[in-house]
Amino acid sequence: PRPQVTPLGDIPDAPAADSNFSQPWTYTDERQLFGVVRGEYDVTDNVMVWAALGARNGEEDNVLANPSANADGTTTAYRFDNTREDDVISADLGVRADFTTGGLEHRLILSGASTQLESKNAYAFSSFAGFANDLYRPTAVTMPDADFFIGGVLSDPLKTEEATTSSIALADMITMLDGRLITTLGVRQQWIETKSFDYNS
């Protein structure tokens, strides 16, 4: 992949569009799989319930060397490897009821939602001293060893993050004055729980 460049001071002139200054040993590989199912059911003419369930599985594997560039186009870069695996499950359910009190039409909605994430990660850096190159005259360098700063095992990343969000909401959409005025009143409570884990244990 053509990498992102970080300027070190003044921004250098853009290299030729047909020039690829990335290293031949860099790559990025990502796969995302999504799925969702949703259903609704009319209990009566005025009451409807719904439920939805979704899931995502993501896998990412990268070997990168994004350069930092001086104004004259000279660069330094170091190798960065990472793997990531995400599993996400989300759910949403609720009930909606329409009714009238006096001259007011109500649409009352009660809903709940929850999302759970589990993430596995590992990384490895080569020496931050890096290697020199040039945006305008790039040359291939030998791939440095990514053994300077390591977190986890790239071939078998461990769980590093858990996150759970959940919420419940109640809303009443009130229609009055023959539909000329609509007011919505609502309350919502949300809970968030996050946990972080050591990359190596």
Protein language model annotation of sequence segments:
Residues 1-42, 55-86, 131-156:
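Acidic/polar loop-and-plug regions of large Gram-negative outer-membrane beta-barrel proteins
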Residues 5-15, 88-94, 98, 105-111, ...:
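Solvent-exposed loop/turn elements at secondary-structure boundaries
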Residues 24-25, 47-50, 106:
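Tryptophan-centered motif/residue detector
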Residues 59, 105, 109-201:
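Signature of Gram-negative outer-membrane beta-barrel scaffolds
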Residues 32-39, 43-98, 163-199:
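Surface-exposed extracellular loop regions of Gram-negative outer-membrane beta-barrel proteins
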